[in-house]
Amino acid sequence: MTTEALAPLVSRGLVAAGLATEAELASQADWLSSLIELLKVRARTVDDIVHQARPYFGQSVTYDEEAVAKQWKDKDATRETLQATHDALAGVTDWTLGSTETALRAMAESRGVSPGKIFQPLRVALTGSAASPGIFDVLVVLGRDRSLARIGGAVGRLGPGSI
């Protein structure tokens, strides 16, 4: 089904789930289309898309405790990695797939770690889950301010230190 055909169905589901109002969705039609395009790949039904869309609404994140336990095992190291991730992304002004990817891959290289050591903890910080679309897609769909706020919230959840 095309994104255009899915949009009204997904919109009804999002409103019914209390994630947004019709007016909010109408004012963000392009953003909603981008989100649907991103999520429909992993979905079989409209309800699947609505469920997958939850992390993209609101300011806070509901963390899957299994994802937290697996991806944030070493809280101090994860906090430090997410703080460094925040710092690297805070310097990105042109928030695109390419610019966020460049910043994070450069950070991984400068730290001598594989990108996955950064991307997986970041995925949990942004979506609360260990599974999501590509991390750069997630960053772009969430937007700069919300992404940085969620990373900061994750750092705070992990203990001492602040952004």
Task: Pin down the residues of each PLM region.
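Charged substrate- and nucleic-acid-binding regions of tRNA-handling and nucleotidyl-transfer enzymes
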Residues: 97-161
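Small-residue-rich helix-loop
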Residues: 2-111
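Short amphipathic alpha-helical segments with coiled-coil-like heptad repeat character
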Residues: 1-5, 130-133
